[in-house]
Amino acid sequence: EGEIVGFLGPNGAGKSTTMNMITGFIEPTSGRIIVDGYDISKKPRKAKRQIGYMPEGVPLYSDLTVKEFVTYMAELKGIPSKEKKEKVKKVLDATGLAEVSNKLTKNLSRGYKQRVSMAGALVGDPKVIILDEPTVGLDPKQVTEIRALIKELGKEHTVILSSHILSEVSQICNRVIIINKGEIVAIDTPENLENKVVNENSVYVTVEDPENKMENIKEKLEKVKEIKLVNENEDKTKKYIIKAENEVDIRKEIFETLAKEGITIFEMKKADATLEDAFMKLINTEEPIPNEESKKEGGEE
């Protein structure tokens, strides 16, 4: 509760199947899915009332107003009539839709349509919110607004966010689950996953080297493991990545050695890993990579 979890995997990994099982659209062939204490196979109605699902593609009824659509979703969820009006108003206010509540959904911008779909998922105050690609197709301003809304939701709900935009997941998620070929290959914070990729200290340097001295500079750098040309720029400068052992800061040695050799440094910066780097490494690994959380949980999934 109060956590935003990123759910990642390459195409065909099983993300959609997993979400369809959690939301009760597909019956699992084995194992159990427990939502707030309810087994979705044995008590589907009670389990589904704990879930708000916003599918990709924003499926709305174009002939309904915003308020009518959210009210209809409240009726489908079995919210009592005496509570319905108040709960609909609550989610319209929370999602910033009060001012457009009487507009037909077909006349809204894509950003507002995303909000309406999210309001439909939120009505009834479910414990778990599942969002499938909530910012796809939005302009930068709309993306910022939806991300801010998701962060607010994460304060009171468990939010499961499926997205192909890894920078988005890194920014707003507390934890990340990565699956590949139907198997969980990692469960950790974005920061820890990024740190696991950096098993060596790497530095990018952009230099002016007309005499190609960089080709033989490695033997003069004691702590350096590898030097690799990244690209040659139009201004005839060259960008290299220089790798050393983990926890070794090689920037001073690089600066002093290159200066001594007469190689002009235009730029030098540490190469930081991203969630995308971690994702690519994990999905290209044959065996699931163990992590501290999975070791602690250890039991039945």
Predicted regions and their residues:
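C-terminal coupling/interaction segments
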Residues: 245-301
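A generic structural signal for secondary-structure junctions
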Residues: 52, 78, 177, 195-199, ...
